[in-house]
C-alpha cells in the first residue's frame, strides 16, 4: 500500500507515462490464435483447461486472426500448410507475436531428416519470438513461453 500512496497525488490518481500504460496493456492481454496440430495441440488445450487456466494471465483465445495479436504454432508444419500459416500471420494486426511450440514446429521434430514434406521450423515461414521446446511440451512449458513473451514485450522501449 505504501508504494501506491507514494505514486498518487493528493487526488488519489496514479500518474504513469502513456508508453508504460500501453506496454502494460499489451503484455497483460495477449489474445492468441492457435494453429494446433497433433500432440502439441492436446497439451495446448490442457493449458487452457481449469487446472492451468491461461485466462488468469490475460490470455484469451480468439477465432479470427484479425482479433489476435499472438499466433501459437504447435505440431508438424508441412509445406502445404505454409501458405495458410503465412496468410493467417499477415491478417493479424500489428504488433503481432509468434510462439513456436514443440520440436516439430521449432525444427521439424523427428521428421526433419527423412520427411520431404516437413518444414524444418516455422521460422522459415514467419518470424518467431519465443520457442517452447519439448515433444510434446507440457502445459507448464507453454505458460513459461507466454511469460517469456510478456517479459519481451515489457522490455520493448517505444511505441512508434
From Swiss-Prot:
It is a peripheral membrane protein. InterPro entries: NADH_UbQ_OxRdtase-like_20kDa (IPR006137), NADH_UQ_OxRdtase_20Kd_su (IPR006138). GO terms for cellular component: plasma membrane; respiratory chain complex I. NDH-1 shuttles electrons from NADH, via FMN and iron-sulfur (Fe-S) centers, to quinones in the respiratory chain. The immediate electron acceptor for the enzyme in this species is believed to be a menaquinone. Couples the redox reaction to proton translocation (for every two electrons transferred, four hydrogen ions are translocated across the cytoplasmic membrane), and thus conserves the redox energy in a proton gradient. GO terms for molecular function: 4 iron, 4 sulfur cluster binding; iron ion binding; NADH dehydrogenase (ubiquinone) activity; NADH:ubiquinone reductase (non-electrogenic) activity; quinone binding. GO terms for biological process: aerobic respiration; electron transport coupled proton transport. [4Fe-4S] cluster binds at residues 39-40, 104, 135. Gene3D superfamilies: 3.40.50.12280. It is found in: Cell membrane. NDH-1 is composed of 14 different subunits. Subunits NuoB, C, D, E, F, and G constitute the peripheral sector of the complex. This is NADH-quinone oxidoreductase subunit B. The keyword rRNA processing does not apply. Binds 1 [4Fe-4S] cluster. PANTHER family: NADH DEHYDROGENASE (PTHR11995), NADH DEHYDROGENASE [UBIQUINONE] IRON-SULFUR PROTEIN 7, MITOCHONDRIAL (PTHR11995:SF14). It is an enzyme of class 7 (translocase). Its cofactor is [4Fe-4S] cluster. Keywords: 4Fe-4S, Cell membrane, Iron, Iron-sulfur, Membrane, Metal-binding, NAD, Quinone, Translocase, Transport. Belongs to the complex I 20 kDa subunit family. Its EC number is 7.1.1.-. The lineage of its organism: Bacteria, Pseudomonadati, Bacteroidota, Cytophagia, Cytophagales. It holds the Pfam family Oxidored_q6. It catalyses: a quinone + NADH + 5 H(+)(in) = a quinol + NAD(+) + 4 H(+)(out).
Amino acid at each position: 500500500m505504501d508504494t501506491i500512496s507514494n505514486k498518487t497525488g493528493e487526488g488519489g490518481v496514479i500518474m504513469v507515462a502513456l508508453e508504460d500504460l500501453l506496454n502494460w496493456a499489451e503484455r497483460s492481454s495477449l489474445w492468441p490464435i492457435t494453429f494446433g496440430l497433433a500432440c502439441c495441440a492436446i497439451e495446448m488445450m490442457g493449458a487452457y483447461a481449469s487446472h492451468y487456466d491461461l485466462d488468469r494471465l490475460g490470455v484469451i483465445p480468439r477465432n479470427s486472426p484479425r482479433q489476435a495479436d499472438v499466433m501459437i504454432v504447435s505440431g508438424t508444419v508441412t509445406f502445404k500448410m505454409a501458405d495458410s500459416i503465412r496468410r493467417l500471420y499477415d491478417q493479424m494486426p500489428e504488433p503481432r507475436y509468434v510462439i513456436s511450440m514443440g520440436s516439430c514446429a521449432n525444427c521439424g521434430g523427428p521428421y526433419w531428416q527423412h520427411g520431404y514434406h516437413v518444414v524444418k521450423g516455422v521460422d522459415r515461414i514467419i518470424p518467431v519470438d519465443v520457442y517452447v521446446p519439448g515433444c510434446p511440451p507440457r502445459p507448464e512449458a507453454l505458460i513459461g513461453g507466454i511469460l517469456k513473451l510478456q517479459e519481451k514485450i515489457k522490455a520493448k522501449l517505444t511505441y512508434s
